[in-house]
């Protein structure tokens, strides 16, 4: 089919940098660039068709971006616009002269229904994409946790290689901020704005409190209902621990309870208070020293009973001894039948003989 169509070669003398041929064959779109030969001249050969022997083939040249007609071809003026044209006779004359040589580049393009030849330039333009920066403000409802876009701003970035390299290296925007999303937390309406920062997301704040083996979370709630916040001194903590130990060991022998309470009071008081025991002039009445004996099913031993009587008869106790002293009577479980009852070896002896606090107390009472 290609050989049956008449061919015509369009030419332009050397001088320009680039020339494009356009006309009725491509609806004046400027899609067919001409080929530059070694001499610097431009030419292109393509098939032409005529509807009738009197019809004309209109065309024009685009020389370095300017639409110009050629003086080597016939010119038609239509409403002040000049265009070149050829007829079927011009094609026959050129073929008889033997100058109608088909250029390979133009033949393939003409057969492909005048495909656009400036596609590479269009691709270059497409590669230069416009860059935008989108800033969103997101509103978060604290009750439901639902997020919605409160506002959105689109800013076009300037075409700068330095800025592009900076974004690729640092991973930040042109304004130097590491994030463009703003979170608004509210209960009913908009209360506040705060920018999200990466280190806040990776390191949430956790408030630690001293509890019974548990740690509170960010909302101040503990994982156990038994845990509590201690705001006591070291002496109060020690006292609570000793009371818990006494509650746990309530079923054991209570013969040494009086000595434990007295030693606890002695450990708590500083040296300045213990020095008051040496002042005999500070005395209180006998009624200030009381004793409480807890009755049990088993009769107490005689030694403990004599101790309580001795405390009640003595006078002149110092102010520091005004505290209540609980003398728990020692108990002893019942022995099986057939055994002879013997004194309890675990019964505490007279504290005045052991020394310490009770020894000083006995000396002062004398």
From Swiss-Prot:
Keywords: Cell membrane, Isopeptide bond, Membrane, Phosphoprotein, Ubl conjugation
PTM annotation (Phosphothreonine): residues: 216
GO molecular function terms attached to this record: protein kinase binding
SS bond partners: none
GO CC list: cytoplasm; nucleotide-activated protein kinase complex; nucleus; plasma membrane
Compartmental location: Cell membrane
Gene3D superfamilies: Immunoglobulins
One Gene Ontology term from the biological process aspect of the record: pheromone-dependent signal transduction involved in conjugation with cellular fusion
Cross-link Glycyl lysine isopeptide (Lys-Gly) (interchain with G-Cter in ubiquitin) per UniProt, renumbered positions: 314
Predominant location category: membrane
Region (Disordered): 159-180, 217-366
Bias (Basic and acidic residues) ranges: 265-284
Biased composition (Acidic residues): 233-247
Keyword Membrane: yes
InterPro entries: AMPK1_CBM, CRP1_MDG1_kinase, Ig-like_fold, Ig_E-set
Membrane-protein topology: Peripheral membrane protein
Modification Phosphoserine, positions: 160, 288
PANTHER family on file: 5'-AMP-ACTIVATED PROTEIN KINASE , BETA SUBUNIT, CRUCIFORM DNA-RECOGNIZING PROTEIN 1-RELATED
Other remarks in the entry: Present with 1240 molecules/cell in log phase SD medium.
Family: Belongs to the CRP1/MDG1 family.
The protein's role, per its UniProt record: Involved in G-protein mediated signal transduction and in the regulation of polarized cell growth in pheromone-induced cells.
UniProt-recorded name of the protein: Signal transduction protein MDG1
Gene it is expressed from: MDG1
């Amino acid at each position: 089919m290609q050989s049956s169509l008449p061919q015509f070669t369009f030419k332009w003398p050397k001088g320009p940098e680039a020339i494009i041929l356009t006309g009725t064959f491509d609806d004046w779109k400027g899609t067919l660039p001409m080929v530059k030969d070694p001499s610097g001249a431009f030419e292109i050969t393509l098939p032409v068709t005529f509807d009738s022997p009197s019809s004309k083939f209109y065309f024009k040249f685009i020389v370095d971006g300017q639409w110009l007609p050629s003086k080597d071809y016939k010119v038609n003026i239509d409403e002040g616009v000049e265009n070149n044209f050829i007829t079927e006779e011009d094609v026959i004359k050129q073929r008889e002269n033997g100058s109608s040589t088909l250029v390979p580049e133009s033949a393939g393009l003409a057969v492909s229904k005048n495909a656009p030849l400036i596609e590479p330039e269009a691709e270059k333009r497409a590669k230069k994409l416009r860059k935008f920066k989108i800033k969103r403000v997101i509103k978060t409802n604290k009750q439901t946790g639902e997020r919605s876009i409160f506002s959105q701003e689109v800013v076009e970035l300037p075409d700068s290689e330095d800025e592009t390299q900076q974004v690729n290296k640092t991973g930040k925007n042109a304004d130097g901020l590491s994030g463009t999303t703003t979170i608004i937390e509210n209960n009913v309406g908009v209360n506040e704005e705060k920018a999200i920062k990466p280190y806040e997301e990776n390191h949430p704040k956790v408030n630690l409190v001293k509890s019974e083996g548990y740690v509170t979370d960010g909302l101040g709630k503990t994982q156990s209902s038994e845990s509590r916040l201690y705001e006591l001194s070291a002496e109060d903590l020690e006292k609570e621990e000793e009371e818990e130990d006494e509650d746990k060991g309530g079923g054991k022998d209570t013969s040494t309870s009086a000595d434990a309470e007295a030693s606890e009071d002695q450990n708590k008081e500083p040296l300045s208070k213990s020095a008051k025991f040496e002042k005999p002039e500070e005395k209180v009445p006998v009624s200030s020293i009381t004793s409480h004996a807890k009755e049990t099913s088993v009769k107490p031993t005689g030694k403990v009973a004599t101790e309580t009587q001795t405390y009640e008869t003595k006078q002149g106790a110092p102010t520091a001894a005004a505290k209540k002293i609980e003398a728990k009577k020692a108990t002893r479980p019942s022995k099986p039948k057939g055994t002879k009852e013997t004194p309890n070896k675990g019964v505490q002896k007279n504290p005045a003989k052991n020394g310490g606090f009770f020894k000083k107390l006995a000396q002062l009472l004398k």
